[in-house]
Amino acid sequence: MPTINQLVRKPRKSKVEKSKSPALNVGYNSRKKVQTNVSSPQKRGVATRVGTMTPKKPNSALRKFARVRLSNLIEVTAYIPGIGHNLQEHSVVLLRGGRVKDLPGVRYHIVRGALDTAGVNDRKQGRSKYGTKRPKG
């Protein structure tokens, strides 16, 4: 326990909160080829690999993911939500934050219905989260 005198000389440091989606907090100046300190809610990127991975221990499935090179030249792993997708290598995708609890290292979600990513077909409820248009009739 420090004395009052020690605290007067060197006060306590406040904790710095770490971002849960750090790649969204980095911009890129392509003219100077330097990373900048600009945050954004979403980022555009190009899928470099599309595949499936298995979740952590109590769960069992084949979760769809894409490895994405962002516009700030950072490469991250992102989850593809919904049933079925049309993504391939070189597809342009929009990324948002949000981790997947049972996939280690996956801290981002791909936004369905934006850029090259199609919305989920035949979805009636929760359509806005999956980029699905309102059904006719």
UniProtKB/Swiss-Prot annotation:
Q: Name one Pfam family in it.
A: Ribosom_S12_S23
Q: Which GO terms describe its cellular component?
A: small ribosomal subunit
InterPro entries linked to this entry:
NA-bd_OB-fold (IPR012340), Ribosomal_uS12 (IPR006032), Ribosomal_uS12_bac (IPR005679)
What are the start and end residues of every segment in region (Disordered)?
A: 1-57
Q: Which Gene3D superfamilies match?
A: Nucleic acid-binding proteins
Q: Name one GO biological process term.
A: translation
Subunit details for this protein?
Answer: Part of the 30S ribosomal subunit. Contacts proteins S8 and S17. May interact with IF1 in the 30S initiation complex.
Protein name from the UniProt record: Small ribosomal subunit protein uS12
Q: Tell me the gene name.
A: rpsL
